[in-house]
């Protein structure tokens, strides 16, 4: 199998665990501060609003359309291509006292006046604020339920100290990703929720691989110290982690650079989540389990007494 590191090389990861804890606490603190002051830039899926799709005869100039809408008082409109270069989607936040159909006609007139081109209305949709509130609750609930299920699974599959490390690592990844979204005011829609759930699953998969090797080495290296076994396990799985994360990031970077405005947020969430998740599987999940005092006794299979063993010991 292809290896980035030599099989006999041992990296002392736990030596830097205190520094990593401080770094993680600072990043989480900064993310919570940003979220508490700026919160998130919710998209129409959550706030409600109007979505209008129009068609041009020639490839549309998005900057010209934005300028035309801004001149008519629609400076908050989000303009992007949808499908082909001739199809344009305009998204607007709710406006008091203006019906969805009337707003669509105003947008269409503004685009025609500003660009001087023939424009056809393709579709108009209105998302009410009540639907947005329901989606917000459902999205948050989906992430919370997934973390609870992961806690139960890892506790049964491994041990509660490892489960605590895994769940806190996942929460760490989600909070930092949301913190960056809050800082940069990237619009959060349903695709971002999907990306966060993808990050949770991806990060967990990486953590489970490391945990499986930790459990195996605790049973094999009976005389080794816990920190030594952790270092050995992470080093042994590091090539797999780097290769998997690297190839995934190549695809995500392609989406980020070539995917267009429609999936910018999705690709950004994956890019951040996978990068932070690779770090957290080593320095949050594993290091936290070590701090909680995990030993080989916690991972050894229970001894089952054979029936009649007490009679075998009798003289």
Regions found by a protein language model. Give the residues of each.
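A structural signal for conserved, well-ordered secondary-structure elements
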Residues: 1-315
């Amino acid at each position: 199998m292809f290896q980035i590191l030599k099989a006999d090389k041992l990296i002392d990861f736990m030596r830097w665990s205190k520094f990593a804890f401080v770094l993680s606490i600072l990043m989480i603190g900064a993310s919570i501060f940003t979220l508490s002051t700026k919160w998130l830039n919710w998209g129409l899926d959550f706030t409600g609003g109007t979505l209008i799709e129009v068609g041009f005869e020639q490839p549309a100039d998005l900057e010209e359309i934005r300028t035309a809408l801004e001149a008519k008082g629609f400076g908050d409109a989000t303009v992007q291509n949808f499908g082909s270069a001739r199809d344009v989607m305009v998204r607007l936040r709710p406006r008091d006292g203006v019906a969805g159909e009337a707003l669509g006609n105003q947008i269409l007139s503004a685009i025609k006046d500003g660009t001087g081109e023939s424009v056809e209305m393709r579709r108009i949709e209105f998302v009410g604020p009540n639907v947005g509130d329901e989606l917000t609750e459902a999205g948050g609930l989906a992430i919370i339920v997934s973390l609870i299920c992961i806690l139960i699974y890892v506790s049964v599959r491994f041990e509660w100290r490892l489960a605590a490390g895994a769940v806190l690592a996942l929460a760490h990844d989600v909070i930092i990703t949301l913190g960056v979204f809050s800082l940069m005011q990237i619009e959060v829609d349903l695709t971002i929720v999907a990306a966060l759930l993808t990050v949770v699953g991806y990060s967990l998969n990486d953590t489970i691989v490391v945990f499986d090797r930790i459990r195996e080495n605790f049973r094999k290296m009976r005389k080794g110290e816990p920190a030594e076994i952790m270092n050995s396990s992470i080093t042994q799985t590091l090539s797999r982690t780097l290769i998997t994360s690297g190839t995934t990031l190549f695809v995500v970077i392609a989406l980020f650079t070539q995917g267009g405005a429609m999936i910018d947020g999705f690709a950004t969430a994956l890019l951040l989540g996978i990068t932070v998740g690779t770090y957290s599987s080593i320095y949050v999940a594993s290091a936290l389990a070590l701090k909680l005092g995990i030993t080989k006794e916690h991972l050894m299979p229970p001894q089952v007494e054979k029936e009649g063993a007490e009679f075998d010991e009798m003289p």
